[in-house]
Amino acid sequence: MAPVTIEKFVNQEERHLVSNRSATIPFGEYIFKRLLSIDTKSVFGVPGDFNLSLLEYLYSPSVESAGLRWVGTCNELNAAYAADGYSRYSNKIGCLITTYGVGELSALNGIAGSFAENVKVLHIVGVAKSIDSRSSNFSDRNLHHLVPQLHDSNFKGPNHKVYHDMVKDRVACSVAYLEDIETACDQVDNVIRDIYKYSKPGYIFVPADFADMSVTCDNLVNVPRISQQDCIVYPSENQLSDIINKITSWIYSSKTPAILGDVLTDRYGVSNFLNKLICKTGIWNFSTVMGKSVIDESNPTYMGQYNGKEGLKQVYEHFELCDLVLHFGVDINEINNGHYTFTYKPNAKIIQFHPNYIRLVDTRQGNEQMFKGINFAPILKELYKRIDVSKLSLQYDSNVTQYTNETMRLEDPTNGQSSIITQVHLQKTMPKFLNPGDVVVCETGSFQFSVRDFAFPSQLKYISQGFFLSIGMALPAALGVGIAMQDHSNAHINGGNVKEDYKPRLILFEGDGAAQMTIQELSTILKCNIPLEVIIWNNNGYTIERAIMGPTRSYNDVMSWKWTKLFEAFGDFDGKYTNSTLIQCPSKLALKLEELKNSNKRSGIELLEVKLGELDFPEQLKCMVEAAALKRNKK
């Protein structure tokens, strides 16, 4: 771990704390000041009786004046999704606050998704007063929101930590159930450090009476900032040189190396260095499904999204030409690895860069070397600095060119003359709708499979739950992304071809079935003045499930809604802040997309309901379903 440095204090209050180290503040205030110190500027959640005393400190003068914002959501699950989206966009810690049992359990699915996809989220849960769990006079009482014992609950007290036990070491990298106010500040800071270190969610259970208790300001004085760089494991100088020398020797001897950009590159904040390395070396580069947009896909040596045998044949063939694969931010799972169909050129060498190891595999010699306990982020930064491009010996096939949207070679049986909107039409049309620097949030659904093979414009940020795949997640995640874009403007842009005065659009691609699960958060987006373009793909139900099984079964149907009438119910009573349009033909879609693409308006919500066929599946979805079926049949 890097040494923690004391940064300069940025305001008068911090200077006051330095001069008065014995100063005390309420613990509730400490929590919110610590959140501000890590650049978490908004908190999501729902009030409940066990967290109200904590929430009151949002309005203490020192916290309120510093700009910490409460974003109340319609339910706790959506708060978890929003906190997830906040972190995915900003690479800061997203935070939600819920109440004992009924609130925290509602959020659990969202937290599980963050855990599965390495998203930094802090879940603060207000629990019963400390005396209720410690005192023999109270601990045997069955409390509301707390499940009783399975047997003899009239005689045995409940397990006050039952929910803590559900999440510890299961969907959280760090959990603190606060019981001693003397160590509470340290426990808060330790959970935050673990969230940064592992890039996974953490929990803090705060007793209702702790918020008002006094704590010292020592931690805020001694460590005024905690950053991800402070929390990851660094190699020694000797280790660093040894690793870099081994990596560069392999690169210099390679004729056809490839860089594979994966999701953990984004989670550990080094995507910019990966793109600099690509620009400096001119090495062919590919993205994974979950690493989509980690690489600037407008670069001249971008070769497409590699997903093994489930990806495009041309991309697969080009990847197979590479004698060395540098896999940055590697995350191995069935979705991200094409149901484990990744293959390499015979005798290729592979280097995997992971937050906990660097792995070098020489398939020709049949051996490998593993450097354990080392985060790849400092390795990537140092590799970019030290690599000598004059020593590269690249000999790529000159007939192979950059991947573009034309590479998809989509077959349209109607030759563009269809009067209905098809998945093929969308794959040809939607990439042109996107501008450099835009932010796209995509729901789990059929269209998500199409987006994989888009060649994105420069500096576009793509956010989607590619592995856990909980439908309904994207809409409240877009709320979190929109809040993060307000708190951390243009955080995703590092150079590229984005116009200097361009204000990025937030675009949500949403399915009708998924939207019905979390649609109410559109009202929160409206309340928070988040500019949003939301496109509802209306194909009358659960299209992915129809592709897998039961295409005409009633269990894949949903009730039809008047999507263009939603906002009157959700708070825009006179239509001043929203505009909704029903689109059923390609020509009308083209006109509307062109209007939005070229508009400078960044206020209000534009909703497009786009009618699609119930049984119209992208080819990428068909391929995945066939691969999954083949895997099932082999068992």
UniProtKB/Swiss-Prot annotation:
Q: What induces or represses its expression, per the UniProt entry?
A: Expression is induced by the presence of aromatic amino acids and the lack of preferred nitrogen sources (e.g. ammonia, glutamine) and requires the transcription activator ARO80.
Top EC class for this record: lyase
Covalent cross-link (Glycyl lysine isopeptide (Lys-Gly) (interchain with G-Cter in ubiquitin)), residues: 588
Q: Which reaction does it catalyse?
A: 4-methyl-2-oxopentanoate + H(+) = 3-methylbutanal + CO2; (S)-3-methyl-2-oxopentanoate + H(+) = 2-methylbutanal + CO2; indole-3-pyruvate + H(+) = indole-3-acetaldehyde + CO2; 3-phenylpyruvate + H(+) = 2-phenylacetaldehyde + CO2
Q: Name one GO cellular component term.
A: cytosol
Enzyme nomenclature, EC number: 4.1.1.-, 4.1.1.43, 4.1.1.72, 4.1.1.74
Q: How does activity depend on pH?
A: Optimum pH is 6.5-7.0.
- What pathway, per the record? Amino-acid degradation; Ehrlich pathway
One record GO biological process: tyrosine catabolic process
- What are its applications? Fusel oils are important flavor and aroma compounds in yeast-fermented products contributing to the quality of beverages and food. In low concentration they are generally desirable, whereas high concentrations may spoil the product. By adjusting growth conditions and substrate their production is sought to be influenced. Phenylethanol, having a rose-like aroma, is an important fragrance in the cosmetic industry and can be produced by fermentation.
What are the required cofactors? Mg(2+); thiamine diphosphate
How the cofactor is bound: the record states:
Binds 1 Mg(2+) per subunit.
Q: Which compartments is it annotated to reside in?
A: Cytoplasm
| GO molecular function per UniProt | 4-hydroxyphenylpyruvate decarboxylase activity; branched-chain-2-oxoacid decarboxylase activity; carboxy-lyase activity; indolepyruvate decarboxylase activity; magnesium ion binding; phenylpyruvate decarboxylase activity; pyruvate decarboxylase activity; thiamine pyrophosphate binding
Q: Which PANTHER family match?
A: PYRUVATE DECARBOXYLASE, TRANSAMINATED AMINO ACID DECARBOXYLASE
Q: Which family does it belong to?
A: Belongs to the TPP enzyme family.
Q: What else is known?
A: Present with 6560 molecules/cell in log phase SD medium.
| Protein name in the entry | Transaminated amino acid decarboxylase
Upper lineage is: Eukaryota, Fungi, Dikarya, Ascomycota, Saccharomycotina
